[in-house]
Amino acid sequence: MLKFFLLPLFAYLLGSIPWGLIFTRLFTSVDIRHEGSGNIGATNVARIAGPTLGALTLVGDILKGVIPVWLATAIAAPNDLWGEIYISLVALAAFSGHLYPVYIRFKKGGKGVATAAGCFAVISPMALVVLILIFIMFVCWLNRVAVASLAAAAMLPVAVWKDTGSGVLTGCAVVTAIFIYFRHIDNIKRLLAGTEPIIWK
């Protein structure tokens, strides 16, 4: 019984690990929170510290979602109502940790896209495949990560519903998408002003 209560806490603490900040401090003299967009996620790390550290950050942030949600599916029955509620709770705990990391005083967290991808890689792999294709399409079309992230987030609940038919898991996807949009408010403002950075020049 104790593991049912400990896993959401573990998910939050794991989700709180600021890999972007850790990698940039280990391998450079940069504090990523004060460079570029100030975000600790993979996109800003890649822009400021290079693609290798950006890729390491991306993998670390994805695993923050994969590991606890996979453990949740091992504990709870994925096709059971209470199992779906528990899995969603664990996923949202990991996602919340990434957004509001306790280790850096709940400030300067990431925008949630990579950790959400890790969560839904376990919850709904087929939905994630569709969202990755949407992400790639928008990156190639508009050359901006923020637009691709927002487009994928908008389609997340639809893709999860189509794949799983679960109201609980779709609700988890809706909450996730709303927070991703909330964390991208500055990007949306820059997009409207025409100042959002492009990927390739």
Predicted feature residues:
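Helix-coil boundary and interhelical linker segments in multi-pass alpha-helical membrane proteins
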Residues: 1-7, 67-89, 121-128, 160-172
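N-terminal signal-anchor transmembrane alpha helix
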Residues: 2-27
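Hydrophobic alpha-helical transmembrane segments
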Residues: 5-10, 54-55, 87-92, 129-133, ...
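C-terminal ends of transmembrane helices
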Residues: 20-21, 95-106, 135-142, 185-189
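Cytosolic, membrane-interface loops and tails of multi-pass inner-membrane proteins
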Residues: 21-52, 108-109, 185, 189-201
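Short, non-helical or kinked segments that cap or interrupt transmembrane helices
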Residues: 30-39, 104-117, 144-152
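Multi-pass membrane catalytic core of lipid/isoprenoid biosynthesis enzymes
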Residues: 47-74, 86
